[in-house]
């Protein structure tokens, strides 16, 4: 199969088709067979759109095509270099499209790595810097990775951790203590919270109204997670009068007319978004019939 074609549209379509086929018919050897082609494409292609699609295809090939943990981490290092250089490392200087793709692919790969402690410091520095990007998509993708890194710094409470203590949030309501903090994510946490708070309330008229809304919605969630890492995307702080507790995560995916799937953690959102980039409107069909997709998001379906 010839992957490198001269026509821009055909090339992007081929890479989407490759990713779709990998998810539909997974193979433990496909990553080894196409890694070099995909890396060469996103490094050398003159089309920014092709670079971005090749980056996403590589992340799908790595996760579903048999890459080892060390290979996943090597790709993540390469993607982080793209982010740190604002795209310059692959001849895509200041391309929001390419840097966004690198951030998104990095986050998707990170969901497959159990222990992120050693990679967290360099990653946080890169993603915090991108919060100042002039491209809203870059800002959001970087912010979602920051939230994921805070989430991954906590793991399930084990016997050695002792019993959970009763902890309360700023309004005196109980905090989930079933997860325990294992390491610090970022030294300048107060400064980070200030930056996230500014983005969550961005009011500059220089930014389009729809982009301001995107910033407000996403960075309110990200700030909430940085403050309380057990809280996932679209966590509703409002209190349910019947239970006396916060409503919690309100992000759901409707599965036909019969049920909903709750996306209450950042790793779930990263995987959902990665699958949707490839599967588009066919996600629900694949979720019901494709074991690979279901195993990526093994979430119980609730009756709606």
What are these language model-derived features?
Residues 22-32, 62-73, 110-120, 151-161, ...:
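Flexible loop/turn segments at the boundaries of HEAT repeats in alpha-solenoid HEAT proteins
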Residues 2-46:
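Helix-rich alpha-solenoid scaffolding regions
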């Amino acid at each position: 199969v010839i992957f490198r074609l001269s026509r821009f549209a055909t090339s992007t379509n081929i890479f989407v088709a490759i990713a779709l086929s990998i998810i539909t018919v997974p193979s433990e050897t496909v990553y080894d067979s196409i890694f070099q082609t995909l890396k060469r494409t996103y490094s050398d292609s003159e089309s920014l759109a092709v670079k971005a699609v090749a980056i996403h295809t590589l992340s799908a090939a790595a996760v579903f095509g048999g890459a080892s943990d060390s290979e996943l981490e090597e790709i993540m290092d390469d993607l982080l270099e793209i982010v740190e250089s604002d795209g310059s490392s692959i001849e895509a200087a200041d391309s929001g499209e390419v840097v966004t793709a690198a951030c998104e692919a990095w986050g998707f790969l990170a969901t497959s790595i159990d222990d992120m402690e050693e990679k967290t410091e360099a990653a946080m520095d890169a993603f915090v810097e991108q919060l100042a990007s002039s491209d809203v998509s870059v800002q959001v993708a970087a912010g979602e990775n920051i939230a994921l890194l805070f989430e991954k710094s906590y793991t399930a409470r084990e016997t050695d951790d002792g019993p959970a203590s009763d902890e309360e949030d700023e309004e005196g309501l109980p905090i989930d203590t079933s997860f325990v903090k294992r390491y610090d994510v970022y030294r300048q946490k107060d400064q980070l919270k200030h930056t996230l708070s500014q983005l969550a309330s961005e009011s500059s008229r220089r930014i389009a109204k729809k982009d301001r809304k995107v910033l407000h919605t996403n960075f309110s969630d990200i700030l909430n997670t940085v403050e309380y890492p057990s809280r996932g995307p679209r966590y509703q702080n409002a209190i349910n009068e019947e239970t006396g507790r916060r409503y919690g995560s309100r992000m759901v995916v409707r599965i036909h007319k019969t049920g909903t799937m709750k996306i209450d953690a950042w790793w779930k959102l990263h995987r959902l978004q990665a699958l949707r980039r490839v599967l588009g409107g066919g996600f629900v069909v694949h979720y019901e019939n494709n074991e690979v997709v279901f195993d990526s998001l093994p979430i119980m379906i609730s009756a709606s």
